[in-house]
Amino acid sequence: MHVKKYLLKCLHRLQKGPGYTYKELLVWYCDNTNTHGPKRIIREGPKKKAMWFLITLLFASLVCWQWGVFIKTYLSWEVSVSLSMGFKAMDFPAVTICNASPFRYSKVRHLLKDLDELMEAVLARILAPESSQANATAAMNLSMWNYTPLVLIDERDPHHPVVLDLFANDPTGSASSSPGPRGACNAQGCKVAMRLCSLNGTSCTFRNFSSATQAVTEWYALQATNIFSQVPQRELVELGYSAERLILACLFGAEPCSYRNFTSIFYPDYGNCYVFNWGMTEKALPSANPGTEFGLKLILDIGQEDYVPFLASTAGVRLMLHEQRSYPFIREEGVDAMSGTETSIGVLVDKLQRKGEPYSPCTVNGSDVPVQNLYGSYNTTYSIQACLHSCFQTQMIASCQCGHYLYPLPRGQEYCNSRDFPDWAPCYLALRMSEAERETCIRMCKESCNDTQYKMTISMADWPSEASEDWIFHVLSQERDQSTNVTLSRKGVVKLNIYFQEFNYRTIEESAANNIVWLLSNLGGQFGFWMGGSVLCLIEFAEIIIDFVWITIIKLVALAKGLRQRQAQARYAGPPPTVAELVEAHTNFGFQPDVGHRSPDAEAYPDEQALPIPGTPPPNYDSLRLQPLDVVESDSEGDAV
C-alpha cells in the first residue's frame, strides 16, 4: 500500500514538473553553480554582464574544442612501443632445410621428357633463329605449347610492334608492313614474352620480360607445375631427395644427431624438406650456452649432379629458422646457403607483443580471421603467411575453378592442369598480378599478436680448404657409400653452423599511448584551467538540462490536451450543461400530458381540466461538484514535499 502511494506521488510529481519557468531555472543555475563565470553574469551591471557573458561563452567554447581534440586523439587508438632487454636460457629454434632442386632429375626425367625437348627447341630458336628454322618440329609434343607459347616481340618500330611465334613460319602482328627477317631480330630489338589466350582465342594478353632467361625460366616452371599437379603427393615424395641422402652429419651441442631427428614435410617449391626441433611430438631442445659449439652443425650433400637443369638454377640449400609448431614458409622467409662453403648463422631473438584490437589489427589464434586456414591439417599455429596463401587459393578456386599446385586444397577441390582446365594458366597469372585481389587478402588477414622473430647474422668461408679437401671427402664418401672411391666434391656439399650469438633477447611491446586515465586527466585539466570546474559542475549542468527538457515535455503535453479540449468544445454551440440540467432532462415524462397525441374521444369530455403534476424540484447538485484531482493532490503534495 505504501509503495503504491509512493509511486502515485511520484507520478503526480512528474506531471507537475520542477515548478519553475525557463528564466527562473536559468537564474537559479547561474546563482548556485560552482563553475566560475555564470554568477558574475547575473550579479554585475549591464556592461559587466555582457563582458562576463562573452568571456564565459569564449572559454566554454575553448573547453569544448579542447575536449574534442583529446577525444579524437583517444579514439585514434595510437600505440607506443617499448623495447626491453632480457637474459635467459632459450629454446633452440626450429630449423627447416630444403634442397634447391625439388626433385632428382634421374627420377623425373620420364615426366619431363616432352617438356625438356620443347625447352631445348625454344632455346635454339631464341639463340640461333636462322640455323634452327629448318629443324623439324613434327616429332615434338606441342600440346602444352599451344596453351601458353613463348613469342618474340619485334619492337624496332615502336609504333608497329610485331609478334613472332617461335614455331610459326608467318609472323602476326599489328604492323601493316612485313617485318624484317628473323635473323635480324637481335636481343636489343626483340623481347621474349609469354602469350596468354583464352580457350576460344578471343582474348590474348602478353606477359613481357626484360630478359629471355626470366621468360624461359618462368615458362618452364609453369609447365612443370602443370605436370606435377597430376602426380599424387606420395609419389612426388619418392622423386625427391631423402633425408638419409641429404644429411651426411649432424651435431647439436655435444650430442650427435642424425636424419632420424628431422621431421619430413613436402613443400611443392622445394620438394622434400626436413625440420629439426619442430616440437610437434617432443619437447623443444634448449640451448645450453651461446656460441658455435652449442648450436647445430650440419654437413649436407645436395647432389648437384642430379639437379633438374631447367627447374633449379640455384645450387645449395634453402633454410629457415622459425618457432616450434609453426609452418615454415621457406620460399618467402628462407635464406640460401651456397655449396662448397661453411655458412655460419648467428641468431638473435626478438619477441613481438602487439596490443590487439582496437589498437593493432592482430589476432591471437586466427579464429577471428574470415579466411579458411588450409594449413590446419599440419596442426601448426596461425601465421599471416598461412592466411595469405589460403586466401589466394580460395580466390584461385573461385576464379579458375581449380587450385594451384603450390598451396593446399580445400576438401572436394582439384589442382589445376591443362587437360581438365585449359584456361587455368591465363587465369592464374591474371590473378597473381591483380593488385585488387592482393589488397583484398591483405585486408582480411591479420598479424599474430605474439610473434618471435629470429635475426640472422650470416658469414661464409670456403669449405673444405684445399689442404683438407682430400681426406674430408674420402671420409664422407666412405660413411655415405661404404666405398673407398671419392663420390663427393666441393660443388655438392654444404656445411652449416647455426647458434645463438648471445642469450640476450629483445622484447618489443606495444602499449596504449592514450588510455582512459590520460583522457580523464586532460578533460578535467582543461575544464578546471579555463572555467574552474569539476565533475560536480558537469552534474549540475546535466541537472539543469534535464529540468529544461522536463519543463518542455510538460508544456507540450499541456498544449496537446488544450488542443483536444478545444476540439471537443467546438461540437456544442453553448456552454456545457450543469448537473441539475442533466438531471431535469432525465425526468420521467410519464406524468406529463400528451399534448401532441390526443385521443379521438377527447371532444367527448370538453370540460375536463388538466390537473397539475405533483412533484418536488431536484436539488442543486452543482453545489456538490467534486474538485479536480490535481487540486486535491497539490494540497497534499505540499505537505509531502
Curated annotation (Swiss-Prot):
Its main location: membrane. Keywords: Cell membrane, Cytoplasmic vesicle, Disulfide bond, Glycoprotein, Ion channel, Ion transport, Membrane, Phosphoprotein, Sodium, Sodium channel, Sodium transport, Transmembrane, Transmembrane helix, Transport, Ubl conjugation. The chain crosses the membrane at residues 51-71, 534-554. The modification Phosphoserine is found at residues 634, 636. The keyword Ribonucleoprotein does not apply. GO terms for molecular function: ligand-gated sodium channel activity. Residues 596-641 are annotated as: Disordered. A motif (PY motif) lies at residues 617-621. Disulfide bonds join 98-273, 185-190, 197-204, 250-257, 362-449, 387-445, 391-441, 400-427, 402-416. Residues 72-533 are extracellular. It comes from the Eukaryota. Glycans are attached at residues 141, 261, 379. PROSITE patterns: ASC. Pfam families: ASC (PF00858). GO terms for biological process: multicellular organismal-level water homeostasis; sodium ion homeostasis; sodium ion transmembrane transport. It is a multi-pass membrane protein. Component of the heterotrimeric epithelial sodium channel (ENaC) composed of an alpha/SCNN1A, a beta/SCNN1B and a gamma/SCNN1G subunit. Interacts with WWP1 (via WW domains). Interacts with WWP2 (via WW domains); inhibits the channel. Interacts with the full-length immature form of PCSK9 (pro-PCSK9). Interacts (N-glycosylated) with BPIFA1; the interaction is direct and inhibits the proteolytic processing of SCNN1A and SCNN1G and the activation of ENaC. This is Epithelial sodium channel subunit beta.
